């Protein structure tokens, strides 16, 4: 076939077994318009019975399927692992002449070696573990004619190119950045792009790439990522990196199918124990709303509850006062720009007119985001008021001391990515605090939506072995 798919030669009966084996219910499918309109049954089928094709990355699962059933199998054109030793990797790294301050850690070298040996893998490595250096080592070692690195946000296009320059690479000469209205064609060997810029491009565009790296792969929309990855028919090297998977089998198998099997690089706890990450504590501030509000809110829809919370004057003043009272640099994350972010910004700016305050959202120019990042790295006290979508993913600010969750979320990926903003260490910081703001609007036995989301976050904090404490606060007004 090609580098995206394999074709399975089997009996019709086995093909139906395979279809059943690789069919999964998509979590939350019942809420989609397609499901409600009865245009989709809410299932994803990874094996196509008609053409007998499946993602190449799922071959290990096909082998397991055969062995469990004692079926005979043969893999034509089987590709064996490359021979690449740890010693060879270390010798190669020396030839890169990395700056003195850049010293690859053992787990980064191990991940680099694993990626080169296997050619296709999904590297599971938490936020702040130094994924950009792993990507750089892979890119430089393979040194193919055309490399495509796909990232989820515009900010990450610039940041990754800047990181490469920090490692000693001539980024301006060899790296082409693609986002927004930028030209997608270039003779430069390394192309860094958002998935949004490429998913509508024709198959011909992708045929020249030999290596594809999907950074923060879990952030891509499944359909768009599939569109891109299945057009990369000649890319024999396929490396994905992700800080976290969403816990569902569907999500994991789709990513493994497009890249390769998951390889766990290191855990957040290990990084903390080794002092590579800041000491991290979570303070959960549970705001108790008055009884009359709770009674009135008991029949709220989810959207009505969110609307009430983001427009609640007492709640917004509480959040603003908290942000203004904290020492160091604070990242305040919100969900809605006009309804919430702007209100919080105006309250804080009005109270602290001479303070370094930054307001970031989806419409903020990429250069402004980069400038903000640079300024905060050298500030002792500032506040960044940023939308979750722009600053929860990949933005690398080491000098952050506090994070405030102003908007409720139960997304495992989004919560862990947001936490990652505070985990990096710097010369002026070795600890960070997350202030998780939750809202208790329970009435009798009726639980409000956002307290259920809070329960999901608490469960996640426990699983990740973070230290957390819950503070109950009466919300006045």
Residue locations for each model-derived region?
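Conserved pre-motif I regulatory segment
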Residues: 43-46, 76-124
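Conserved RecA-like P-loop NTPase helicase motor core
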Residues: 244, 361-463
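Conserved helicase ATPase core of P-loop NTP-dependent helicases/translocases
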Residues: 158, 173-186, 331, 342-343, ...
